[in-house]
Design a protein with these regions (language model features):
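Conserved catalytic motifs of ABC-family nucleotide-binding domains
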Residues: 104
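Helical segment within the ABC ATPase nucleotide-binding domain
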Residues: 123-135
């Protein structure tokens, strides 16, 4: 059960609608590196678009404004028209976070979001997650192997070893 919904009973359209409420952040960023930051963020809208708009990359003014606002929320609005492969790892992770924010999720699931980042950048990304949780009231669930970061940032920590809860 997630937020009062028994996810095991969902199928088809109701399952897709439920999944749209959950944003995903991946360790490897999952960006299209040969295109601009703004185009990467705009991909958040593709699942809700008619096939012909998705095929030809036609986005509405409102979608573009939401994408720019999401970039602003993570502090990289100035990188909107830069190719994703020209960014640092921390900036790429912020693009992934902006893409997730653009879909207006209620929950963000982050899989090792700081694993490939240096300690200073990892702290900045974790600060972003904390601010988003606090200011936007979005639940953030992070899978992380850095115990010290988990203890520093999380309001609740669950330790798992070999499939068993140990903490």
């Amino acid at each position: 059960t997630v937020d009062g919904t028994d996810v095991m009973t969902l199928h088809g359209k109701s399952l897709r609608a439920f999944r749209r409420r959950i944003g995903m952040i991946f360790q490897s960023f999952n960006l299209i590196t040969r295109t601009t930051v703004i185009k990467n963020v705009l991909t958040a809208f593709v699942p809700d678009m008619p096939w012909w708009r998705a095929t030809f990359g036609i986005f509405t003014k409102d979608e573009k404004l939401k994408a720019l606002d999401s970039l602003d929320k993570v502090g990289i609005l100035d990188k909107a028209f830069v190719r994703a492969d020209q960014l640092s790892g921390g900036q790429q992770q912020r693009v992934a976070l902006a893409r997730t924010l653009a879909q207006n999720p209620q929950i963000i699931l982050a899989d090792e979001p700081v694993a490939s980042l240096d300690p200073v950048t990892a702290k900045q990304v974790m600060d972003d997650f904390k601010r988003i949780n606090r200011d936007m009231n979005i639940t953030v669930l992070i899978n992380i192997h850095h115990v010290e970061l988990a203890l520093q940032y999380a309001s609740r920590v669950v330790g798992i070893r070999a499939g068993e809860i140990v903490y």
